[in-house]
């Protein structure tokens, strides 16, 4: 009686991780192949390409620093928030101040906040 593909899958599903690793090693030896070669042959660089193509950034305040009042002023200027909301955002760091910014606008806002004494990231 021949084993079906489903029987093999069920048998592998019941194995421990160590047993599966041993099975893979035995198959590599039997058929003269390497499991690592299959990984290399797969499509690669998908995440790197996406990172290069990113056009919208989020401005994230990671820390207000020593000069919190100056940072609040710049946050109000960049976001258009009122004093109370800007203070809450600065006190609640890390906080996303603005989403979907262009690279140029994000860099400009980041520079202003860093000059005011804040720590900022563009994500």
Swiss-Prot record:
The keyword Plastid does not apply. SUPFAM superfamilies: ClpS-like, Ribosomal protein L7/12, oligomerisation (N-terminal) domain. It comes from the Bacteria. Pfam families: Ribosomal_L12 (PF00542), Ribosomal_L12_N (PF16320). GO terms for biological process: translation. Keywords: Methylation, Ribonucleoprotein, Ribosomal protein. CDD domains: Ribosomal_L7_L12 (cd00387). Residues 100-115 have a biased composition (Basic and acidic residues). Residues 94-123 are annotated as: Disordered. One of its GO terms (cellular component) is cytosolic large ribosomal subunit. One of its GO terms (molecular function) is structural constituent of ribosome. The modification N6-methyllysine is found at residue 84. Gene3D superfamilies: 3.30.1390.10, Single helix bin. Homodimer. Part of the ribosomal stalk of the 50S ribosomal subunit. Forms a multimeric L10(L12)X complex, where L10 forms an elongated spine to which 2 to 4 L12 dimers bind in a sequential fashion. Binds GTP-bound translation factors. Belongs to the bacterial ribosomal protein bL12 family. Seems to be the binding site for several of the factors involved in protein synthesis and appears to be essential for accurate translation. This is Large ribosomal subunit protein bL12. It comes from Halophilic eubacterium NRCC 41227. The gene is rplL.
